[in-house]
Amino acid sequence: MSMDNLIRIIEKDQVKEVPEFRPGDTVRVYVKFKEGNKERTQAFEGIVISLRGSGVGKTFTVRRIGANGIGVERIFPLYAPIIEKIEVVRRGKVRRAKLYYLRNIRGKVKIKERR
């Protein structure tokens, strides 16, 4: 058995069911936080601006406009145990795989909806 096959077998156990989404989609990510001995869930909603990597190491970047119009970006590992669930709120229609140009645009961004 080669090392590559061994890695694939181990990764199969780690992969969990996640909805299909692409850059331009608006998603709501529920993240688990541990504060002392309590555990709570916090939602982070924004536009997916990039997907990178493959397999268990796949990550995605979500950007939203926070308080006072300041942009907030978070990079989430797709199969991390801290992610409780991912909901796709809106499907966006874009022509780029990486939406880094949204960083330079001030205010709210309008992305056409995909059917």
UniProtKB/Swiss-Prot annotation:
HAMAP family: Ribosomal_bL19. Belongs to the bacterial ribosomal protein bL19 family. It holds the Pfam family Ribosomal_L19. Signal peptide: none annotated. This protein is located at the 30S-50S ribosomal subunit interface and may play a role in the structure and function of the aminoacyl-tRNA binding site. Keywords: Ribonucleoprotein, Ribosomal protein. The gene is rplS. This is Large ribosomal subunit protein bL19.
